[in-house]
Curated annotation (Swiss-Prot):
Catalyzes the synthesis of GMP from XMP. Keywords: ATP-binding, Glutamine amidotransferase, GMP biosynthesis, Ligase, Nucleotide-binding, Purine biosynthesis. It comes from the Archaea. Pathway: Purine metabolism; GMP biosynthesis; GMP from XMP (L-Gln route): step 1/1. This is GMP synthase [glutamine-hydrolyzing] subunit A. GO terms for cellular component: cytosol. GO terms for molecular function: ATP binding; GMP synthase activity. It catalyses: XMP + L-glutamine + ATP + H2O = GMP + L-glutamate + AMP + diphosphate + 2 H(+). It comes from Methanococcus vannielii (strain ATCC 35089 / DSM 1224 / JCM 13029 / OCM 148 / SB). The lineage of its organism: Archaea, Methanobacteriati, Methanobacteriota, Methanomada group, Methanococci. InterPro entries: Class_I_gatase-like, GATASE, GMP_synth_GATase, GMP_synthase_A. Residues 1-189 form the Glutamine amidotransferase type-1 domain.
Length: 189
């Protein structure tokens, strides 16, 4: 099972449904859920930090990003929270994204396995990661956001600024499936 921490974003149920469509059980929990409570459940294989409207109401997610022994994927606000937890800078975007954008993949690495070097994705955010710490590596960018995706260099921690769970994102299902593979899920392909 994948546990999804609900940061109040409009797509949290869409994340759960997208995982269900690929055969991965998922449960939505409050963003205040204790990491120890999550990790003591042997059925949970990974954590997704959802999007949401307010970075100040999701500080528990930073603790999870820093200390989880399970793989973590941050989506939108979740992506920003991971970067912030490790010392990155999150600021207002120069160009707020509420549209489809072209994502350019720099490194195929894990979540972008078999994803084309360029694809269209749905973005919906006012803030973005402006600077990442040395422990994170940029995996993808767009013309208006330099950090559309990253990976921790030593841990199974990932972030995507765009929304892989919505149908407007090309290869979004594959990106989610790749994260689930990192978590240990197997698929008949």
């Amino acid at each position: 099972m994948i546990v999804i921490l609900n940061n109040g974003g409009q797509y949290v149920h869409r994340i759960q449904r997208s995982l269900k469509y690929i055969g991965v059980p998922a449960k939505i929990v409050l963003n205040s859920t204790n990491l120890e409570e999550i990790e003591k459940n042997p059925e949970i294989k990974g954590i997704i930090l959802s999007g949401g409207p307010d970075i100040t109401k999701a500080t528990n997610c930073e603790n999870i990003a820093l200390n989880s022994k399970l793989p973590v994927l941050g989506i939108c606000l979740g992506h920003q929270l991971i970067s912030k937890a490790y010392g990155g800078k999150v600021k207002r975007a120069e160009s707020e994204e509420y549209a489809s954008i072209k994502i350019h993949v720099k490194y195929e690495n894990d979540i972008f396995k078999n994803v084309p070097n360029e694809f269209t994705a749905w973005a919906s955010h006012m803030d973005e990661v402006k600077e990442i710490p040395d422990c994170l590596e940029v995996l993808a960018f767009s013309e208006i956001c330099g950090v559309e995706a990253f990976k921790h260099k030593e841990k199974l921690v990932y972030g995507v600024q765009f929304h892989p769970e919505v149908s407007h994102t090309e290869h979004g299902e594959l990106i989610l499936k790749n994260f689930c593979k990192v978590c240990g899920f197997k698929f008949n392909e």
